Amino acid sequence: MKIAAAALMAMSLIAAATAIRAQEEGAPQSGRRGAVGPVQSEKYHTQYIRLGNQAEALLYEPAGTPKSTALIFIHPDRNTFTAPVGPQMADRGYRVLMINYRGDAEAREANQDQYLPAISTGVTFLRGLPGVQKVVLTGHSGGGHLVTLYGNIAEHGSAACKDADKIYPCTAQGLDGLAKLDGVVILDSTLGAFHAMSSVDPAVDTSNNHRNPDLDMFIAANGYDPAAKKASYSAAFAKRFYAAQAARNAKIVNDALARLKAIQNGTSDFSDDEPFVVEGMGDQASGARLYQPDTSFQAHTKAQHLLLKADGTNVMTVIQSMRPPVGQRTGSALKSLSVMTQNTTVKRFLATSATRTAANYAITADDVIGVDWHSSFNMSAGNAEGISVPALVMTMSCHYLVVPGEIIYDHLASKDKSYASVEGAVHGFSPCKPEYGDTVKRTFDYVDTWLSRPGRF
């Protein structure tokens, strides 16, 4: 929604949030992260900002005179306040507004289109601060597809997320007239709805109790090493697997559309939405993904890009993913509700995960082919085609997103766009081995360098 100047003046700027604590990723404390320290530093201070009635933010302000470019950071987990982007970029002289969307608070995650009006409010808020001349939207991981979704709709209106190509249209209010951006920074992003689709286990039909051994990526006969929890799949198995994964995905999407029709025509038990449980479909980073135990998939980019090396040099080269095999818990948790089951609703599934593929669908060493990048409004590559402002895509080379990052980069309409990868950095920016040095510093130094280039904005 658009926020008038009077409304902005009414936003509460509460005292510095000294009690807010940083939180560790993945700490097993009732699903929450553990406290590790206050969000304060000699180089910056923070203020809690209320953005209307559906969002909150933490504003990082540098101790000295801030730079004229300000950043917004967004992530769908709605827990952004202590993400590294805030303190790292504030250390480098930037104001950073870390936004948490709080609408639909009872749900673990809201549909991505629901976040956008709050982001727009944040853009307008930053533009009202003294000295701010440019506003750049930044997202990491799942926040990357929020960045591309916002950027596309801010430039082209809500028609961009409800055209005939979409399996399910955006439904949020207030998507026309979103505040325009001056640039975007996309950090180690997933591909959006396709990331969910790629977790579908084709060895499952409708029940985890019955697995098809011809399609089971977690058995030795197909190339999986259960002791080492890594794999080497044959080309024949991969071809069979991807064909079956696409077929099962199409059935799941069609089942969801049939239930949507039942809701709409009144034959469902529910009038607004209904439960939708998909066994054998991974939750977030879990799933039946060949590229997790077998690193020959999504192994390298097609083209040369800038590699930020540990020795301080920057070289143009094909980016190699140096990750170890991952996804070790999936094979031993195939019947887990929290690991290998989508426990969602019909409308949420269609809005966040429904993807259309073609007969040639496959994930290769350097590409993802046969995906309709316009079939979901929650698709990073499709939305990137609607972004014309300067754009930076960064990947972490000790993770499996170097190829998705290149796909997003290739689809960007921006004339001024850059792709850079950080040698030896994992998804959370730290080094996978000590010899790769301070990968966190290298990452955010480059973001600063890119933002600061004269004439960029």
Stretch-by-stretch model annotation:
Residues 423-428, 432-457:
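Catalytic active-site module of serine/aspartate enzymes centered on a nucleophile-bearing elbow/loop
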Residues 25-66, 432-438:
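N-terminal cap/lid segment of alpha/beta-hydrolase-fold proteins
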Residues 387, 393-395:
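Short beta-strand/loop motif that positions the catalytic acidic residue
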Residues 399-405:
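Conserved alpha/beta-hydrolase "acid-adjacent" motif
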Residues 67-76:
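Short beta-strand element of the alpha/beta-hydrolase
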Residues 89-106:
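Conserved alpha/beta-hydrolase
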Residues 218-382:
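Alpha/beta-hydrolase
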Residues 109-130, 145-154, 158-163, 443-445:
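Alpha/beta-hydrolase active-site loop
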